[in-house]
Amino acid sequence: MEVGVCSESICCYSSRVMADTKSFTEVKNKILSAHENAALESKLQFYNTWAENYEQDVAVLDYRAPLLAAECVASFFKGDKERAIILDVACGTGLVSAHLRRMGFCQFVGVDGSEGMLDLARKTGLYQELKQCMLGQDTLPVQNESYDIVVIVGSLSVGQVPVGVIRELWQATKPGGYVCMTTRGNADNQDYKTEMECMVRMMEEEKRWSCVTVNEVEKWERAVSEHESGYISGTVYLYQRTY
């Protein structure tokens, strides 16, 4: 297993923070309001409404997970990028697939629970197929052992997608294929991260996959919690299915 620690520099940080203060406050309040609504129907409504401004808002947060995950996949994938079929789980508006497309990958299937997000993903023209699915409630609507790469970015966290979905990601991946996952490292997500890493290690002990790399990133995104400031950390995990 390879473990890397990344300390990412943010260009023109001070000047941009001053310029974005009002926007950041608005985005922070929006996200905190979503965390308060635990009911599934409320969350769906939130994401459907947020979809139109999602990309602008996460840019204010310096949300870098989609790029970091795409770079991780592109660095270790040694096959034919144009022929590789990628399953983008919790795809949102398509940020991860957009980065992967710029890196030479061409074939994408997207899954998300929000029809509003899927509508915008559809407009990108990136995806050959898009499916609606409530992860953790519905079974992932894909055939087993069908994808060269499976990615899930931003949704493996407390109050979002349950840890058990990780086994479905493995099932969707071809033997020899890759699964790329991310999670946040802030205090509110520590219990979830511990549970997630326990599941990942258990599957490694079961010989289902092997660890390719785990990248700890110090500056993942700007903190929104009232008891945190600056940036929170995050982690990119890349595993290769063995059977």
Label each PLM-derived region with a short phrase.
Residues 2-41:
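N-terminal auxiliary segments of SAM/dcSAM-dependent transferases
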Residues 63-83:
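Conserved alpha-helix/loop element of class I SAM-dependent methyltransferases that forms part
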Residues 84-139:
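Class I SAM-dependent methyltransferase SAM/SAH-binding core
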Residues 139-150:
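A short acidic, Gly/Pro-enriched loop at the edge of an enzyme's catalytic core
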Residues 152-153, 182:
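Residues lining the SAM
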Residues 163-175:
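A short glycine-rich, Lys/Arg-flanked "PGG" loop and its adjoining helix->strand segment in the class I
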Residues 178-206:
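Conserved class I S-adenosyl-L-methionine
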Residues 205-243:
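Class I S-adenosyl-L-methionine
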